[in-house]
């Protein structure tokens, strides 16, 4: 069976497993005015007439971004996002939570970062987390997507509670971090705001900086809509902490806070098919895995000691055979299937 056929089967299985178990059917969506504020590049931030969506532009002069009007002590942060098309090398679109403006040396952060690519190559993305300024202990995972994120809107979400963090793409949980005592202050614990930005990261974003942003294709436009923010809104510097127990109870009662058996199977398949780097398997960087790592033998066997995918063997031979037989470069492991039967 070809790599392309396998990917299409993966997508169909996702549809069948998750169609009736959506974690996002009853989200309370907000307008820009009632939940968000411009962060920078105001002229490159374009709000829709109904105030329910916003376009972030990057040109040769500046990028742009927005921030939530409030900070939250734990929360659920979600938006439908459509990424720029065509040549996007050097471009980064970020959807993340942070408190770096308040706690500069001890900040917490939860990241979803989309990394642009040259024309004909797919967007990649990565997730990461920091607690209490632990930026020297990066916890990156990097992935491909099973769809073209520049063709349609897809929902990207971050859940953060005192006990767990879940990153979602549409109805698929792609990463779960369970807090344990050994993580200590590395687990994010201080109030955070939501951020979304588009910016030029030509020095590292695409092939380690080999390919730069090309402003012949500007403006690069990222679109956001259907914002959802739930959590305990707090003042991060107040002397008496607020009681957020009711808010946490609400978060943990929602469907997006738990992963059912079908979703867990989808997460396992996603990670087996589309994750191409994990810090948990990077034994050169971390000879002993960090305490939250759950080592999955089926995953570990696919990675080198650098935490990157092994290339070679049967997969490499299959890719070469497919190229010879079908002469379709899009079936290489680095490409994304273009399938309209998505969730």
Curated annotation (Swiss-Prot):
Annotated region (Disordered), positions in chain: 306-343
GO-annotated biological processes: cell wall biogenesis; cell wall organization; xyloglucan metabolic process
Gene Ontology annotations for the cellular component aspect, listed alphabetically: apoplast
Active site: residue positions: 109, 113
Entry keyword set: Apoplast, Cell wall, Cell wall biogenesis/degradation, Disulfide bond, Glycoprotein, Glycosidase, Hydrolase, Secreted, Signal, Transferase
GO molecular function annotation: hydrolase activity, hydrolyzing O-glycosyl compounds; polysaccharide binding; xyloglucan:xyloglucosyl transferase activity
Chain positions carrying an annotated carbohydrate: 132
Leading EC class: transferase
Other comments on record: In contrast to group 1 and group 2 endotransglucosylase/hydrolase proteins, it may not contain the ligase activity, and may catalyze endohydrolysis xyloglucan polymers only.
Annotated protein name in UniProt: Probable xyloglucan endotransglucosylase/hydrolase protein 30
Gene (name only): XTH30
